Amino acid sequence: MDQGTMGYQFENWATTYSCEPELYFEPTTVEEIRQILELANQRNKRVKVVGCGHSPSDIACTDNYLVRLNKLNRILQVDKERKWITAEAGILLSDLNEKLDALGLALSNIGAVSDVALGGVIGTGTHNTGIQHGILATQIVAMTLMTAAGDTLECSNTVNREIFQATRLHLGSLGVVLNVTIQCVPAFRIHLQQFPKTLTEVLGDLDTHLKQSEYFRFFWFPHTDKVTVFYADRTNKPIKTTSSWFWNYAIGYYLLEFLLWISVFVPRLVPWINRLFYWLLYSAKAEQVKRSDKAFNFDCLFKQHVSDWALPIKQTRAALEQLKDWLDNNPNVRAHFPVEVRFVRADDILLSPCYRQDSCYINIIMYRPYGKEVPREGYWAMYEEIMKRNGGRPHWAKAHSLLRQDFEKIYPAFHKFCSIREELDPSGMFLNNYLEKTFF
């Protein structure tokens, strides 16, 4: 058995959270995972499984045992007739996408980042956009996990169904996910279209946009009424990409980071920067054709703070208008672009932000140019207040201020999930500070 490594330091991608676990493990077999859990039981230690550290919160942090499943990354089974793929939980989506493409398959929807582990990305409710599509976990048809007692447990819509409703968004609190079976679709290409609008126009015609494009989303540029609309739809057209190092990186990365760094010292520049980059990169019509996963992924640029809440889709207009009005009436508060707005179908996953409601996700961002912190407290607090006012639920992977008493009010199935968690992990082996605030 891997005896674990001492002195390992974990830091998330955004470098906003870190920890130094007592022992760090990279098991290579299911039996080694069982031995790690046995050791933790013997020594009364807690265990956290971490993926690639993309979550902008402390959800993966622990000072006990940290386990990474990156060496458990195989495809175990391919059911060509049903288009089901069973893969180990440590496989990266980027690797899975390539293997699926070689099989003539694809996932029907994925998030913005593919350098993430399969078992982790479903555990926090990762989503993309498309009102016909649920969060990523809705594509899961079966899972196998190991409980704190070292038992393996299979679940699906027909086997241990209630546990399946919980494990598809598990928060790392139910056990160690061993493998996942995913419903795939035939490989497809995406026609991407980008065009300018105003926020007033988009909100006034929201239903039309939702019907017009399968994967519709938009960027709003705070301190302006400017919006860039993105349509993404399946196509048989040949691949056609337009990539420019100058515009994408010299301007869209390096110049932007430099100007945002200057704005730390001259905050009044932020509205000007938002307008400038809208004009430089987002004000013109553009179109491309890409392989589906390449179309869904995009560059998250440099280090950042983000917050992302889902609210009932009928509250989209009210929430964005309230946020815009507040920023307009508080000129000393600065907000970076973009505010990204996406749409997701309802589901029956117990802790899904989309539980039993079609949802709009509103994601705000404040960059940390060259690692420099930017004032954001007032913006963050008012954003959360507006989201709460409009029936919002926070993205589990992203930092928020809610506690158990809040979740009890906004999640009808919260107590049901808690009962399942207590049944599978009665001693709290898989808890950490993040989860204690959630469940206690």
From Swiss-Prot:
Cellular location(s): Microsome membrane; Endoplasmic reticulum membrane
Residue span(s) of domain FAD-binding PCMH-type: 17-187
Membrane-protein topology: Single-pass membrane protein
Main localization category: membrane
Root EC class: oxidoreductase
Cofactor(s) in the UniProt record: FAD
Reaction(s) this enzyme catalyzes, per UniProt: L-gulono-1,4-lactone + O2 = L-ascorbate + H2O2 + H(+)
Keywords: Ascorbate biosynthesis, Endoplasmic reticulum, FAD, Flavoprotein, Membrane, Microsome, Oxidoreductase, Transmembrane, Transmembrane helix
SUPFAM superfamilies: FAD-binding/transporter-associated domain-like
Top-level lineage group: Eukaryota
Functional pathway: Cofactor biosynthesis; L-ascorbate biosynthesis via UDP-alpha-D-glucuronate pathway; L-ascorbate from UDP-alpha-D-glucuronate: step 4/4
Record-linked Gene3D superfamilies: 3.30.465.10, 3.30.70.2520, Uridine Diphospho-n-acetylenolpyruvylglucosamine Reductase, domain 2, Vanillyl-alcohol Oxidase, Chain A, domain 4
Ranges that cross the membrane: 245-267
Keyword Nucleotidyltransferase: no
GO BP: any one term: L-ascorbic acid biosynthetic process
InterPro entries reported in the protein's UniProt record: ALO_C, FAD-bd_PCMH, FAD-bd_PCMH-like_sf, FAD-bd_PCMH_sub1, FAD-bd_PCMH_sub2, FAD_lactone_oxidase-like, Oxid_FAD_bind_N, Oxy_OxRdtase_FAD_BS
GO molecular function: D-arabinono-1,4-lactone oxidase activity; FAD binding; flavin adenine dinucleotide binding; L-gulonolactone oxidase activity
Cellular-component GO terms for this entry: endoplasmic reticulum membrane
EC number in record: 1.1.3.8
Pros-8alpha-FAD histidine PTM positions: H54
Family assignment from sequence similarity: Belongs to the oxygen-dependent FAD-linked oxidoreductase family.
Function noted in UniProt: Oxidizes L-gulono-1,4-lactone to hydrogen peroxide and L-xylo-hexulonolactone which spontaneously isomerizes to L-ascorbate.
Protein name: L-gulonolactone oxidase
Organism: Scyliorhinus torazame
